[in-house]
Amino acid sequence: MEINKAISNQNVIITLKGRLDTMTAPQLDDEAKSIDFDEVETVTLNLKDLEYISSSGLRVILALYKNLKSKGVNLKIVNVSNTIMELFSMTGMSDYLDIEQE
């Protein structure tokens, strides 16, 4: 998986490309832990080029959401494919995550 991070004003945009699974989920976790939350209002996950997400990937996104919420930082997930949106819906994550489909 490829992860790109860009910072614009008080927004961190993390773009994921490839597969978010057991092998690659720790990469996203490490990237999220490297963010200076004192300077950030919103973290945006751009999933436009994400092909697949496993339960490990969902777990990392849930942990990121909880961590950000405890710090008063918003998590926004954008460019979600129909397939990945189905997973968010089936797990109930779509009920509390700010998600925008493609």
Regions inferred by a protein language model and the residue ranges of each:
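STAS-like cytosolic regulatory interaction modules
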Residues: M1-Y52, K66-E102
